[in-house]
Amino acid sequence: MSPSLIDNYPTAGPAPTSSTSTKDTRPTIADQLIPTVRPSPPRYFGNMNTSLVESKFLTHPGDLGIVAVGFSGGQGKPGVDAAPAALFESGLLDQLRHDLGYNLHGHDAVHEYADLVPQHDPPHRGMKNPRAVSAVTKRIAEQVYAHAREGRLVLTLGGDHSIAIGTIAGTAKAVRERFAGRKEIAVIWVDAHADINTPETSGSGNVHGMPVSFLTGLARDSDEQFFGWIGDEHRISVSKIVYIGLRDVDPGEKRILRENGIKAFSMFDIDRVPIRSYGIGRVMELALAHIGADTPIHLSFDVDALDPMWAPSTGTPVRGGLTLREGDFICEMVHQTGSLVAVDLVEVNPRLGPAVDAAHDTVRAGCSLVRCALGETLL
């Protein structure tokens, strides 16, 4: 892993001039989107926070709320519930506390939510385990909200991607309350899959493929035990979600994306030939420009966005994905905006993988993504 240097970003005041300099100093989109690093100290660093980026929307940016979700009910492969413990055992919390200088809150245990999982949970509208997923995500929303309303950055470690119903709902509600309705969150969804199926368009019935449809209101149910607890205060606008890294999208999802004008960047956009190149840097500029510079951001990162070369231990791997460096860069760019308010890392499954070291490599990749999102720098 090689995070970007702070010196790569613009500083306050005019740049030094030189008669021999050939550097192009014209502002780019990234220059306009990424907060200026001023010579005076930012508002808050935490104990020894290495980030030099001033937070726009957090009153306590040095405080990090941790929600560890040991839940796998949104899909059918066991093991993803073991991811938070594996991330803890890898030393992630010590890295966040000692290397990045965060004050950690709520990080003592992995939540398994056994009290919320019914013994009998038949399908509803084709959804598998609907009562369990609904009840667990409601609890997660409450946990994330409790941190976010205090003005803390929130990190949720999953678990499968169905948990984003809860994480994003909790963030959305807290931001609306903290800013008296004047702000709504945007979501950057980094994933090989769109996860925007409705119960009716899903071929599998797995709810981890449906969270965005419930969060945007494209899928609804009046019964609280089937996600009826999601209210307007929990929802996000289709105009404030951006996908990055898509490469395995169901036919029904493609129709939903087109009909709703949802901004999405596939691997094709990232990999365009040089003469019409986007590349990950240009894609991030366009993604952030779409969101706007004055919008709180919730970053939801599915590790299967990475190519299986980098993250083999995940439930639905798809070849042809992001490199780890590209994934780290996405996280670094989002951090550099100063707009980040919440991060999810999901779908690490330590029990899956083609080789002995697969789980270790995937956990290590997940830790790298988290550290980059939370401000790790080389200098």
Indicate where each model-derived feature is located.
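Conserved alpha-helical scaffold segments that buttress catalytic/binding sites
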Residues: 10-13, 24-379
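Serine residues within intrinsically disordered or low-complexity segments
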Residues: 2-4, 18-21
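PEST-like, low-complexity acidic/proline-rich intrinsically disordered segments
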Residues: 1-12
